Amino acid sequence: MTKTLPREEYTDLFGATVGDRIRLGDTSLLAEIEHDHATYGDEAVFGGGKTMRDGMGMQSGTTQADGALDWVFSNVVVVDPVLGIRKGDIGVRNGRIVGVGKAGNPDTMDGVDDELVVGPSTDTVPADGLIATPGGLDIHVHFNSPQLVDHALASGITTMFGGGYGGGATTCTPGPNNVKRFLQAADEWPVNVGFYGKGNSSQPEGLAEQVEAGACGMKLHEDWGSTPAAIDTCLEYAESADIQVCIHTDTLNESGFVEETFDAIDGRAIHTFHIEGAGGGHAPDVLELVGHEHMLPSSTNPSMPYTENTFDEHLDMVMVCHHLNPDVPEDVAFAESRIRAETIAAEDVLHDTGAISMMTSDSQAMGRMAEVISRTWQTADKMKQQRGPLPEDDGTDADNHRIKRYVAKYTINPAIVAGIDDYVGSIEPGKLADIVLWEPAFFGIKPKTVIKGGFPVYSQMGEANGSLMTCEPVEMRPRAGAMGNAKHGLSVTFVSGTAHEAGVGDAYGLDTPVRPVDGTRSVRKADMLYNDYCPDDIDIDAQTFEVSIDGEHVTCEPADELPLAQRYHL
């Protein structure tokens, strides 16, 4: 006899299923379940009197060596830029994603996937009612403080690319010895890392020694001179070394205007940092670069989304970040040229249309490490409020396309640009099991658990002397995976292919596995999932700074209230 459950009762027991919609945090965004892998009546449920017991949902004779999972996150809603929005069980084995599907005991349950068998060596994490996203990537990190890693993990970021080592504002780690020392220091961090070398040189020899030492990419920064000669030399070397180049262009237009920079790039792939320009870049029209297929644009989070406070906050930040003197008129003019309300307003819209493909932090160099994810979703909500549903979502009573567009900005797209999408960026089989679990009410602002390489590294945890894990104060705390030698097996250190072949990991005594970046030079805007729009006639007025596409003014109103903000913080 089949028992039929009302939808509300089923959701209370096993989480949402096909057709259910989930509100993300206190935003207006609604995620609708597109597919459920469950076999109704045979759900994998852990606990007293539940199904994941010996001879029931657990196949007793299957060992880990036979293929049983290490972990299964049961009945979780997956929000993923590649897999979409679906419900199922996530299987993890040897630190890698096995798959999203139906887990359990095939001897007693219907529909169990062959590769998702639960055995005595499997730990089941009851994730019904939770949302799982891929671990986030931030590929514009100023490593000024080692404590950035704690804030990154606590917010759901599990991969960090950047440079610097304290005291400097540029996102690069110049020189082979500095690269070596930073790689050795980062061996203590339970995150995936990669470091950029200094790309500002009109001769290639200084670039090569940094890449051979372990730099995973190069950074061109105006404070070191982003001249056409340096740009061309860096990109020419990058083509031979298969590394990505990131650029912070010339705000003052001293060595050329945006047209000269475009000509120097000459059709080669390049990651254009803070493309709007408040973080730096040709004033006032660096934003015009979003309209080209080989330009891979990102934003940094201080200007996202545009609010009534954004303009005033940025002036002071620029003065401090670039060591400017408020008593020197030229320094003040430099700062004021970078901060333009009109281009900041257009930036939100360009994200919503998919013209800007990635979100990053610019940590401690105007941006905030722990706000990449929250500001991404604040922008998505603001755009829904001001612009309505996207055409792809119109009539669905949900926001699935917009949700996939925005989650891709800090997961799969930066992974593709950095050349590491074989390892991270989505919850696809074979990738590192970097997973963030969220309670829907706290989605985008406070993770419940951060899984790194298939093991918990941070989670909401109560007082250690309390009788239960839920005893207050409950706060984000490190877990066992962040400690001892465990952390080395959970992460990857990314270097150039040249450095990997040379064995820098062994030479430097690194315990964390070292892997090469790959495929960076062929990346184009068309490869950016849900964010591949190339406006072919974008113009910035040199006097008013107004942005237009095909003659149509692109702008939005500053927000005076945002979700995922004070409601969640004391």
From Swiss-Prot:
Needed co-factor(s): Ni cation
Binding site for substrate: 221
Source organism of this protein record: Natronomonas pharaonis (strain ATCC 35678 / DSM 2160 / CIP 103997 / JCM 8858 / NBRC 14720 / NCIMB 2260 / Gabara) (Halobacterium pharaonis)
Keyword match Signal: no
Residues of the Urease domain: 135-570
Protein name: Urease subunit alpha
Cofactor, free-text remark: Binds 2 nickel ions per subunit.
Listed InterPro entries: Amidohydro-rel (IPR006680), Dihydroorotase_CS (IPR002195), Metal-dep_hydrolase_composite (IPR011059), Metal_Hydrolase (IPR032466), Urease_alpha_N_dom (IPR011612), Urease_alpha_subunit (IPR050112), Urease_AS (IPR017950), Urease_asu (IPR005848)
Annotated localization: Cytoplasm
One Gene Ontology CC term in the entry: cytoplasm
Main location: cytoplasm
Entry comment on modification after translation: Carboxylation allows a single lysine to coordinate two nickel ions.
Chain residues that bind Ni(2+) 2: 219, 248, 274
Stored Pfam families: Amidohydro_1, Urease_alpha
The keyword Metal-binding appears for this protein: yes
Catalysis: reaction(s): urea + 2 H2O + H(+) = hydrogencarbonate + 2 NH4(+)
EC identifiers of the protein: 3.5.1.5
Chain positions recorded as Ni(2+) 1 binding sites: 140, 142, 219, 362
Record pathway: Nitrogen metabolism; urea degradation; CO(2) and NH(3) from urea (urease route): step 1/1
GO molecular function, one term: hydrolase activity, acting on carbon-nitrogen (but not peptide) bonds, in cyclic amides
Family: Belongs to the metallo-dependent hydrolases superfamily. Urease alpha subunit family.
Keyword annotations of the record: Cytoplasm, Hydrolase, Metal-binding, Nickel
